[in-house]
Amino acid sequence: MFGPVSVEMIIERVDEVRGKVKAPPSKSYTHRAYFLSLLADSPSKVMNPLISEDTIASLDAISKFGAQVNGNKIIPPQELTPGKIDARESGTTARISLAVASLARGTSVITGKGRLVERPFKPLVDALRSLKVKISGEKLPIAVEGGNPVGEYVKVDCSLSSQFGTAMLILASKIGLTVEMLNPVSRPYIEVTLKVMESFGIEFERNGFKVKVHPGIRGSKFHVPGDYSSASFFLAAGALYGKVKVSNLVKDDPQADARIIDILEEFGADVKVGRKYVVVERNEMKPINVDCSNFPDLFPILAVLASYAEGKSVITGRQLRLKESDRVKAVAVNLRKAGIKVKELPNGLEIVGGKPRGFTVESFNDHRIVMAMAILGLGAEGKTIIKDPHVVSKSYPSFFLDLRRVLNEG
């Protein structure tokens, strides 16, 4: 069990976890639906959006660009207004805003804080400059002189982030553009973008990751599905400690982190997938080798699973060091503190499973590190202390409340 949610969280070992939880709304879908609502030709309703620090940053951004927001209803402006967009620590907000700012006549400045000011933007800046957009800077803050992107075709290097491709696809939906995405990582996120575009009536033809987008965005009543990334922590708890059912998960959703289902089976867990739920039950854990390049947000919780699997697991990914933290380093530091044998690789970790002990979590101000280590702590000998549990608000504000609820059911 654990102490109260406040400045500090204390998690203690539990004998078993048995319960159910409803997956929160998807962060990825919420971001995309907000920005397409901003650019649509008529009002939209975004139903069941995620309310978190990152999605609030996107909601504030579309308001700055001129959208009227009234509850779930979003009324697009007749003309976008330029301004200062504070993306806070949301990479998706910053990158889509940068592309949208190219449509707003006048100067917009995209800012942020924390690790976001260190994260890459140059490939997106280069793509926009190829459309004759005047941009100052290649890291935040970035100034954009918007109003009239010119061109019919653009290449964007997506080897560092699929968000560059998403940003250009959303821009293309307004002006009509063929977008060729080169070497995309996290490819399922592109599929999510295209799925949301379809819901807003956007027509396109694609050949792999070359997409010809026709201009025209219709207002939509968009229902945000559940988030596999947030659900992954509870699914992992079921695999490690008992049995957990997570509802509000759509079967065959293109979300990158839906891969958690297959990976849990590889680890040895018993998994049952229903039309709108997933049940995971404990079994003997086996080590695995997995490349997280297409689903980097699963890396922390997969490392936790590997910590309990007898033998050596290898978990890698192309851009793990470029997230909210250097996740390779962040996970390695915490697992070593828990007494787990870890070898740091250039793009991932070798982890030898063992018996974790309680420790004080170093969050690196990364929501997914905190949530993953909370799950680790449920099976560790002794107390696991989280000094800044509030960082989960970036993506899953109710995480600890949901965790408490699941533990109380068992």
Curated annotation (Swiss-Prot):
It comes from the Archaea. Phosphoenolpyruvate binds at K27, G91, R119, Q163, R327, R368, K394. 3-phosphoshikimate binds at K27, S28, R32, S161, S162, Q163, D297, Q319, K323. Coiled coil: none annotated. Signal peptide: none annotated. Its main location: cytoplasm. One of its GO terms (cellular component) is cytoplasm. It catalyses: 3-phosphoshikimate + phosphoenolpyruvate = 5-O-(1-carboxyvinyl)-3-phosphoshikimate + phosphate. GO terms for biological process: amino acid biosynthetic process; aromatic amino acid family biosynthetic process; chorismate biosynthetic process. Keywords: Amino-acid biosynthesis, Aromatic amino acid biosynthesis, Cytoplasm, Transferase. It is found in: Cytoplasm. Its EC number is 2.5.1.19. Pathway: Metabolic intermediate biosynthesis; chorismate biosynthesis. One of its GO terms (molecular function) is 3-phosphoshikimate 1-carboxyvinyltransferase activity. Catalyzes the transfer of the enolpyruvyl moiety of phosphoenolpyruvate (PEP) to the 5-hydroxyl of shikimate-3-phosphate (S3P) to produce enolpyruvyl shikimate-3-phosphate and inorganic phosphate. NCBIfam families: aroA. Belongs to the EPSP synthase family. Monomer. This is 3-phosphoshikimate 1-carboxyvinyltransferase. It comes from Pyrococcus abyssi (strain GE5 / Orsay). The gene is aroA.
